[in-house]
Amino acid sequence: MANWTQLGLQDASSPLMEELIYFHDYTLIILTLITILVFYGLASLIVSSNTNRFFLEGQSLETIWTVIPAVILIFIALPSLQLLYLIDEVNNPFLTIKAIGHQWYWSYEYADYRDLEFDSYMIPTNDLTLGNPRLLEVDNRLTLPSQTPIRVLVTSSDVLHSWTVPSLGIKMDAVPGRLNQVNFFISRCGLFYGQCSEICGANHSFMPIVIESVNFSSFENWVSNFLNE
């Protein structure tokens, strides 16, 4: 969950988010070095009064400023392609969830369990208890086991939505009439907050996502209690 005045990314709670943060830092270093080099060249050009009236062409210089940017782009593209593969790879998930976007709430279906489905609405500010985050808490949390491969099928019943949980590195569009899938692996137990990230109408800001990650035995107990209610 993001903190007040936080400037950086949220703490990673999945291997995918760890890789995304690493790629962000790696790319930022390259961009910083390029920015310093460009500003140094501009400053030298402004400050220096030396000119060369006989300098008409420079094949070597043109080769250098063509090859070096190409090499830099390759060094950025390779880890980026690796990340794209990891995002799309689904390897034998233990649990499959279907997340359906509505105006303006989410509903969840556990495909591996019969009759395990519910709607998840934001709790109004007046009904919050002490310690609950405003505009982020819901009446029914999505309970998932930690240390388990999970697949989520995302769709919508009306307009475009987007199912997003930043600390897990997840953002998947919910498109009417189409099933998109995303996979993740939660590294630790805890509460992970997200929101719809696609403008979907008047109450777009009021359809949060809350994932409660628990150990596997607690998850089995939760499923048993839910089905017995």
Swiss-Prot record:
Signal peptide segment: none
An annotated GO BP: ATP synthesis coupled electron transport
Keywords: Copper, Electron transport, Magnesium, Membrane, Metal-binding, Mitochondrion, Mitochondrion inner membrane, Respiratory chain, Translocase, Transmembrane, Transmembrane helix, Transport
Recorded catalytic activity of this chain's protein: 4 Fe(II)-[cytochrome c] + O2 + 8 H(+)(in) = 4 Fe(III)-[cytochrome c] + 2 H2O + 4 H(+)(out)
Protein location: Mitochondrion inner membrane
Cofactor: Cu cation
Residues binding Cu cation A2, per UniProt: 196, 198, 200, 204
GO MF annotations in UniProt: copper ion binding; cytochrome-c oxidase activity
Topology in membrane: Multi-pass membrane protein
Domain of life from the UniProt record: Eukaryota
TM regions (residue ranges): 27-48, 63-82
Keyword Transport belongs to the record: yes
Gene3D superfamilies: 1.10.287.90, Cupredoxins - blue copper proteins (2.60.40.420)
Chain ranges on the Mitochondrial matrix side, renumbered to this chain: 49-62
Binding site for Mg(2+): 198
UniProt keyword annotation of Transmembrane present: yes
Cellular component, GO, one term: mitochondrial inner membrane
Enzyme nomenclature, EC number: 7.1.1.9
Binding site for Cu cation A1: 161, 196, 200, 207
Family the entry assigns: Belongs to the cytochrome c oxidase subunit 2 family.
Quaternary structure note: Component of the cytochrome c oxidase (complex IV, CIV), a multisubunit enzyme composed of a catalytic core of 3 subunits and several supernumerary subunits. The complex exists as a monomer or a dimer and forms supercomplexes (SCs) in the inner mitochondrial membrane with ubiquinol-cytochrome c oxidoreductase (cytochrome b-c1 complex, complex III, CIII).
Stated role: Component of the cytochrome c oxidase, the last enzyme in the mitochondrial electron transport chain which drives oxidative phosphorylation. The respiratory chain contains 3 multisubunit complexes succinate dehydrogenase (complex II, CII), ubiquinol-cytochrome c oxidoreductase (cytochrome b-c1 complex, complex III, CIII) and cytochrome c oxidase (complex IV, CIV), that cooperate to transfer electrons derived from NADH and succinate to molecular oxygen, creating an electrochemical gradient over the inner membrane that drives transmembrane transport and the ATP synthase.
PANTHER family in the record: CYTOCHROME C OXIDASE SUBUNIT 2, CYTOCHROME C OXIDASE, SUBUNIT II
Full protein name: Cytochrome c oxidase subunit 2
